[in-house]
Amino acid sequence: MINLRQQMPHYLRLMRFDKPVGIFLLLWPTLWAVWIAAKGAPSFKIAVIFIAGSVVMRAAGCIVNDFADRHLDKHVQRTQMRPLASGSVSVTEAMLLFAVLSLIAFTLVLLLNRLTVELAVIGILLALVYPFLKRFTHLPQLWLGVAFSWSIPMAFAATVGHVPAVAWLLFFAAVLWPIVYDTQYAMIDREDDVKVGIKSTAILFGRYDRLMIGLLQGSVLLTFGLLGWYLRFNYWFYLGLLVALGLMCYQQFLIRHRKPPDCFAAFRNNNWVGFFIFLGILLTYRN
């Protein structure tokens, strides 16, 4: 018999509710899309569904990730005390929790139109496959970018009934962004990952990691600039991009010596990048 009161702290850790930055990194692209699709005036229903869905799916994704990595996590110093790796949560408990979260997410998406439901099925498959890719390719961060950005076509489908070209332009920018911050994150564990056979862009880029991150950061901002021009956004949007540029330069400063605590700080700093881009979008539609 599961003692919920005793296990709840472990469940919350398994779902990473003790590390909310991951929720926001998933939420910002969702909010970008919800606001742009609705031209700055999203319906309360759609906004709530997508915000709640982001929180739930991030939690579910963390469970799948830890399930896939439970044997590898024991050999990486930073992850060896994760609930599944340490045994504080059983595989059965994790799967039951995942099933509950999936049911909640499915219930939410059923409140939307058919196209959004169909896209949601693809989104679930993207999330399920991602954790296993790091064994076979050095580009799991690219797949993560697609999975984390899949809420964008869903938001447009829910709002306007189809996925226009501008949605895919936003999607492209959003896909590149997680490659940036998850490469910074992977730099923390690079030595341990090499030992246990985990692949990542941090390992692929090697000593060119900062250069590649910089090129990706520039591509993100350039794509957003093109998006702003296409949508005729005003100066508020570009001020948001300017702040994002400053934050990205700060991240380059942080990772210059590739020290794990500084790489983690750079990763966390991306929350503010997403926030200021969203703030620029929000203020553009209000002025």
UniProtKB/Swiss-Prot annotation:
It comes from Coxiella burnetii (strain RSA 493 / Nine Mile phase I). This is 4-hydroxybenzoate octaprenyltransferase. Its main location: membrane. Its EC number is 2.5.1.39. GO terms for molecular function: 4-hydroxybenzoate polyprenyltransferase activity. The gene is ubiA. The keyword Ribosomal protein does not apply. It catalyses: all-trans-octaprenyl diphosphate + 4-hydroxybenzoate = 4-hydroxy-3-(all-trans-octaprenyl)benzoate + diphosphate. The chain crosses the membrane at residues 21-41, 44-64, 91-111, 112-132, 139-159, 160-180, 211-231, 235-255, 263-283. Pathway: Cofactor biosynthesis; ubiquinone biosynthesis.
